[in-house]
């Protein structure tokens, strides 16, 4: 038979031991939690480093590079597309101006084509419009390119109405060269030179435009002299090395006019991408 006093004695002792062991367990839990906090604080930088390594993982690098490459490729394609469009427009403008102005010169008997030339492949001077169209495309693309290279974007009268007025003045200068009669060619040349400089001052006023206009006038005059010297065609009453002395003025004003057209076409066109 169990003894009652033993049961009563063991009961409080057991409860006491339980109450004494519970604070020990709680103390151990606090120590464990403190250790976990220390471990977590120590492993934080390593986790950040791991995330950083993941962000710079070479596997992700090609993906971002591929996206950038696609954007650059589309930008290049867009730039080339605009370049082709501008070239075609400038070529067409050069062909039309050549047809109109050459017809005007021929009607006024300023330009004469010998019979032996007309009887050959140069019949009706079919080569003049394509050559003028090609020259117009080159000049029209060169003007905005020089502006971009010099870091001086042309902002003077950048609207199509001004460009069309410039074209009208250029045609008027060419018409005056064929129709006006002066006492001598020097007066005519000085008058056309003043009109050409007035065209540049009215519609351009840029140093690059003036320099390119003078360069174009010199090169075009030299090429024309070579063609006339080889008998491809000739001018009536030549007064300056087989040609007319006012011809450089026509080339100068034509370069300024085509340059303004090229600048206007270049507005809103994305810049050429630069490869590092």
From Swiss-Prot:
The chain crosses the membrane at residues 84-106, 126-143, 159-181, 185-203, 209-230, 245-262. There is a cross-link at residues 155, 157 (Glycyl lysine isopeptide (Lys-Gly) (interchain with G-Cter in ubiquitin)). It comes from the Eukaryota. Residues 1-26, 49-73 are annotated as: Disordered. A motif (KxHxx) lies at residues 270-276. It is a multi-pass membrane protein. The keyword Endoplasmic reticulum applies. Residues 107-125, 182-184, 231-244 are extracellular. Oxysterol-binding protein that mediates feedback control of cholesterol synthesis by controlling both endoplasmic reticulum to Golgi transport of SCAP and degradation of HMGCR. Acts as a negative regulator of cholesterol biosynthesis by mediating the retention of the SCAP-SREBP complex in the endoplasmic reticulum, thereby blocking the processing of sterol regulatory element-binding proteins (SREBPs) SREBF1/SREBP1 and SREBF2/SREBP2. Binds oxysterol, including 25-hydroxycholesterol, regulating interaction with SCAP and retention of the SCAP-SREBP complex in the endoplasmic reticulum. This is Insulin-induced gene 1 protein. It comes from Bos taurus (Bovine).
């Amino acid at each position: 038979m169990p003894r009652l006093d033993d049961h009563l004695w063991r009961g409080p002792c057991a409860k006491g031991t339980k109450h004494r062991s519970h604070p020990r367990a709680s103390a151990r839990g606090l120590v464990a939690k403190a250790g976990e906090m220390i471990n977590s604080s120590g492993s934080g930088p390593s986790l950040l480093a791991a995330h950083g390594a993941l962000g710079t993982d070479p596997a992700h690098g090609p993906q971002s590079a591929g996206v950038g490459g696609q954007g650059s490729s589309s930008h290049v394609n867009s730039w080339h597309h605009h370049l082709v469009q501008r070239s075609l427009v400038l070529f067409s403008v050069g062909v039309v101006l050549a047809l109109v102005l050459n017809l005007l010169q021929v009607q006024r008997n300023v330009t004469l084509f010998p019979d032996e030339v007309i009887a050959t492949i140069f019949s009706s001077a079919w080569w003049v419009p394509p050559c003028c169209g090609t020259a117009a495309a080159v000049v029209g693309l060169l003007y905005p390119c020089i502006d971009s290279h010099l870091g001086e974007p042309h902002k003077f009268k950048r609207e199509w109405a001004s460009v069309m007025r410039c074209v009208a003045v250029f045609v008027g200068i060419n018409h005056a060269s064929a129709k006006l009669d002066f006492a001598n060619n020097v007066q005519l040349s000085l008058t056309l030179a003043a009109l050409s400089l007035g065209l540049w001052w009215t519609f351009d006023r840029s140093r690059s435009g003036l320099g390119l206009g003078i360069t174009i006038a010199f090169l075009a005059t030299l090429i024309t002299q070579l063609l006339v010297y080889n008998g491809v065609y000739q001018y009536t009453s030549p007064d300056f090395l087989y040609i007319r002395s006012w011809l450089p003025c026509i080339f100068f004003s034509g370069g300024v006019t085509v340059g303004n057209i090229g600048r206007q076409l270049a507005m809103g066109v994305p810049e050429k991408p630069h490869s590092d």
